[in-house]
Swiss-Prot record:
Belongs to the SAICAR synthetase family. It comes from Methanosarcina barkeri (strain Fusaro / DSM 804). This is Phosphoribosylaminoimidazole-succinocarboxamide synthase. GO terms for molecular function: ATP binding; phosphoribosylaminoimidazolesuccinocarboxamide synthase activity. The keyword Ligase applies. Pfam families: SAICAR_synt (PF01259). Its EC number is 6.3.2.6. Keywords: ATP-binding, Ligase, Nucleotide-binding, Purine biosynthesis. The keyword Coiled coil does not apply. GO terms for biological process: 'de novo' IMP biosynthetic process; cobalamin biosynthetic process. CDD domains: SAICAR_synt_PurC.
Amino acid sequence: MTREQLYSGKAKTIYKTDDPDTLITEFRNSLTAFNGEKKGEMEKKGYYNAQISKKIFEMLEAEGIKTHFVEMLSDIDMLVKKVEIIKIEVIVRNIAAGSITKRYPIKEGTVFKTPVLVFDFKNDEYGDPMLNDDIALALGLATQEELATLRELALKINELLVPHLDKKGILLPDFKLEFGRRNGEIILADEISCDTCRFWDKKTGQSMDKDVFRFDKGDISKAYEEVARRIVPEIFE
């Protein structure tokens, strides 16, 4: 399969293929935090994130959630369906952590009675600001019906992920989702990995995600490897 680079993001590179209906996502070893202000590299990061995403996409597909995942072409190359990305990041919060504890009088570790769902404008230039429905509509990012669909899908994904990860000794304080339009439908895109989720060890509360790099909490490689061992143990056999 031929490939031509379409664009390169903070941690993934996207390629065109000879099939206009598919793209290749290459998961790189790049680490970034604070909108690219802090940078680093980690051996096998791309591998772990790609394999974690694959496994979670497959689980969600089995539960009726449509995703852009097609197949793995290599350890780090994922063949995906081409979608029109919706420029809205959908954040689902189950336990208070990160920015919400700085913006509001909520203590870190507070368990929300119901998930807190937030929309952010996917735009680095403006620092990914929070959106409400009116602003999203004014910017032409989505229709009212699409916003409702984003909420419905995100909450359904959360309902599936929380117990799935809990069985593996992982808490899911919050995570970011991205969606795209394809053939009149909205489907899950991007990735679900240590880069896009907060993963805490169920017993210790220890971070096992990009916060380890972001806030110098310890060995980032060990954190990502531990999550991979729990979610995709077969890659270590």
